[in-house]
Every structure is written in C-alpha cells, then in structure tokens.
Amino acid sequence: MNRLLKQVCMVVVSSFMMASMLTHAASLPDFTELVEKASPAVVNISTEQTVTTKTANEGGQQLGPNSEELNEFFKHFFGQQPFGQQAPPQQGQRSSLGSGFIISHDGYVLTNNHVIDGADVIHVRLNDRREYVAKLVGTDPRTDLALLKIEADDLPIVKMGDSDKLKPGQWVLAIGSPFGFDYTVTAGIVSATGRSLPSDNYVPFIQTDVAINPGNSGGPLFNLDGEVVGINSQIYTRSGGFMGVSFAIPSKVAMSVVDQLKSDGKVSRAWLGVLIQDVNNELAESFGLDRSNGALISRVLPDSPAEKAGLKSGDIILEFNGQSIAHSGELPYIVGQMKADEKVDAKVYRDGKEQTISVTLEARPNDPKVVAQSQQDQNRLGMIVGEVPADMAKKFEIDNGVVIEQVLGGTAARNGLQQGDVITMLNGKRITSVAEFAKIAKDIPSGRSVPMRVIRQGYPMFIPFKIMD
C-alpha cells in the first residue's frame, strides 16, 4: 500500500511540475513570426577605406585574423587602440562591418555614423543577397546616426514605433551582423530608458540587456509588435566584450534626425552651452533642495547662451521651456529639439530660491570646446593638495582651484576623491589657492554635507562632500 501511495505521489508531483513548466514556457514570447517579417528589411553594411595602419610594436600583442575589426571595436568603445598597438605607419585598405535597416520603399537606409565614418565606398547587402553601393545622404555624429540611399524600388521596410512608450521590463529584440554573422537574432528586456552618457548627451538612450557585439551597430531594436523602437549603438564593457549592458538610440530621436538629413543633408540644433549632471539625494540635501531632480550645472561655457543669460555653475535647472527636468539627461534632448534664436525661460534653483531666467538659444558651434581636465592631488582632510600648474591650467582651461596630489584616506577617500582631481569650488565658494581651500574646509562642521565641484579626467562634476570625524 505504501509503495502504491509513493507511486501516486510521484505521478502527481511530476504532473504538477510539467504543468508549471508548460505554463512558464507559454508565458515566454515567441519571436519567430516577428523575425520572419522583420528580417527582409534588415541589411548588412560593409565599407572600404584607405587608411594609415599601425602594426604591433615589440612586446605588442597580436590580435589574430580579425585584428582590424577588433581595433575598430577598441577605438569605438575605448577611444584608443589596444595596448601595444604602435608601430611605423603603413598604407592599406580597411573594411568595417555593421548593420542597418530600410526605412522607405525607395531605398533610404538608417545606420550608425561610426559604421560608415571615413568610408570611401559603402556596400549594402540585403536579406536576399542583392548588393548595392550606397550614397551617403548625411550624418549626425552627435547622435551617431547616418542616412544612406540605395538605388532600388519596392524594397521591404521596417515599421517605426514610438520609443516614448517603452518601459523597463518590456521584451525587445535585435537583428544584426555581430562579427559578420548575418541576421543574428538576440533578445532581452529594456533595463532603463532616458540614459545619459557623458560622450552622447544629446541622446536619451534605451538601456537593454540584449546581446550586442561589433557588427550589431546600426541595427534595429524591435518591440514585440515588430516595430523599430531603437537603433543599437554601443555597449558598456570592462572586458572588451558584451557584459549585459547595451544602449540604443530611441526611434523618436532617430526619425527627427532623418527628417533633417533628408531635407538638408545635415542636422541643426540649438545650443545652451553648459555641462550638467544629475542631482542625487545627497547633492539635493547639500544644496538645500527638497527633492532630487533637475539638471545641476557643473560648468558654463565661455561666450555661450547660458553665460550671456546669467546662468552659473551650481545652478540647478528645474524647468526648461515649460518642461520639467526630472534628471539631467532630459535637458540636452529638450534643447536639441529647439531652434536657434528661440527665447525660452529656465526655472533654476540658486542660493536656496527658485528664479526664472530668460535664455536666447543659439546655433551650436561645429566644435565647441567643452572639455577641461585634471591630473594630480591635494591637502589636509585626508588629502594633500597643491596649486594647479600653469601648463595644466592653460592646457585644460582651468582658471581656479587646487589639485589633489595625494589621497591619504579618511575624509577624502570616503567621499570618493581621487588623485588628480581639481577642486574648483567648495560649499559654494570658489577655490583660488591652497590656503583659501584650507580656510573654507576648516569652517565646515563635521558631519555636514556640502557641495564640492571637481574636475576629473576632463569632466567637471559636483559631489556631496562630508567631513568625517
């Protein structure tokens, strides 16, 4: 009897587990139909370019048969060649690989600017293996988008979706050519929306965990309705490979750029002229703000619309042109959608009060110099500081501050300060000398958090600084 009871229990448990597995499987999306419908409008893009190349020096590492593609990968994601890659220059041919997709029946193709940047010839290969030499209609390096045109008719096209409707947790799918493997399909979820990256602050990126690798760039990101909601652009990595964090340009941003490229061959956008950062809870507290939102100005560029309007470093922009700023990444996009010579109101928080400042926007310069930088380290409070060397100040456009020459631990270390940071402001007061820095720091009570402005590796930012006992 006991034996029979055990067998019955095993059957019941097995049935329950099987039912649970089937229910779970049924709840997962089936991408088959989506891929079949969307793939014909996805293209493979390859380029030819005559370049001056470098070979590995003594002790340099060899990267194998696909070294050129890997070199491009390192260059795009890290801004430099792999370690050891220096040698006498040689003339040669370089090819790059990427993805794209067809947005009109008469042959307009959208991809990333970095996929075709500097190319002499651009090849577009369709799903049915037809191949065309594409004409470059225009590019927008600030959003990393490029519009191509191939001479063909009745082409399959993608359906464009509304990226504003995307929410974290929704399924998304990518089709592209990672490492040259055509029409590779990967899927994942939206991790976040509105991500602002330091080098691309005109794009509120879609962050996903979809596997993206070299060759995926420029390819479409689909929602479950088969609509393109993003253009896969870049990844975050410490290993050189995919680590679960990838970024896509929202379709809304892309189509705005496409419209201008089609009509003018270039993109014009308004310019405010500030460097900004998010306001976290500690910064909000240190500024006396009752909520952690807005865009904190860390630097006002010389002769910019912001400077002319009277905006200052340390101002927190709460609203711009009537639109609330929840986080700093929203401001560049709002400004970028506006036209030069538009006059707008900015609601800012300054010295514990809200005020409205009128700003007249201007056309963005082709190459505004927005970067300052830093190198060494500082004094007291767990650090040794020194005067900023004249050559450093001139080179990086630093007009005041002290440089951290050494972090000793304690307060400096706990506040995240690093050797090479340049401290330009503390508790709302400009730092002009080592003595002045020590005096201002001495007047700050222990345990109280105050705003500190630092320049780190060329990027200015505010941090909440708290003196530890």
Curated annotation (Swiss-Prot):
CDD domains: cpPDZ1_DegP-like, cpPDZ2_DegP-like
InterPro entries: PDZ, PDZ_6, PDZ_sf, Pept_S1C_Do, Peptidase_S1_PA, Peptidase_S1C
Compartment annotation: Periplasm
EC number: 3.4.21.107
Keywords from the named record: Hydrolase, Periplasm, Protease, Repeat, Serine protease, Signal, Stress response
Signal peptide: 1-25
Gene3D superfamilies: 2.30.42.10, 2.30.42.60, 2.40.10.120
Catalytic-site annotation from UniProt: H114, D144, S217
Keyword Glycosyltransferase listed: no
Class of this enzyme: hydrolase
UniProt keyword Signal, yes or no: yes
GO cellular component annotations of the record: periplasmic space
Binding sites annotated in the UniProt record for substrate: G215, N216, S217, L272, G273, V274, L275, I276
Domain PDZ: 261-352, 358-458
Catalytic reactions of this protein: Acts on substrates that are at least partially unfolded. The cleavage site P1 residue is normally between a pair of hydrophobic residues, such as Val-|-Val
Gene Ontology BP terms: proteolysis
Domain of life: Bacteria
GO MF entries: serine-type endopeptidase activity
PANTHER family: PERIPLASMIC SERINE ENDOPROTEASE DEGP-LIKE-RELATED, SERINE PROTEASE FAMILY S1C HTRA-RELATED
Family classification: Belongs to the peptidase S1C family.
Free-text function comment from the UniProt entry: Might be efficient in the degradation of transiently denatured and unfolded proteins which accumulate in the periplasm following stress conditions.
Protein name per Swiss-Prot or TrEMBL: Probable periplasmic serine endoprotease DegP-like
